[in-house]
């Protein structure tokens, strides 16, 4: 992932950044997957295939969460502008999807963050709080979020 500073929410350090290298992300994802109870749709088999098949024009970012320096949460976020009711434009952050109908034909079931099983009760709420803080209460706004150098 590239540049900037991570913020701490509760006991977590949360950061958002670009995918640096596919092998690096894969190794981190598989390590966390071994410590989580995620569904197939949070597995590297699913996420890795998704990333490998995305066109270069679809940027995805990696949300990473650390607790005491240990990686305890991962997710892909993509920014997309959607049109609702044919007239309302809304910016969205899509979790483990792109936001483009033609690319998200296979929609994941049981979609969620990949979370270390020791943090399933507290980590998702901390991520939501972090995202809401980054949004700064602006409805419909996509945050310009800080990014980090490492997973």
Where on the chain are the PLM-derived regions?
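N-acyltransferase acceptor-side catalytic subdomain
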Residues: 1-151
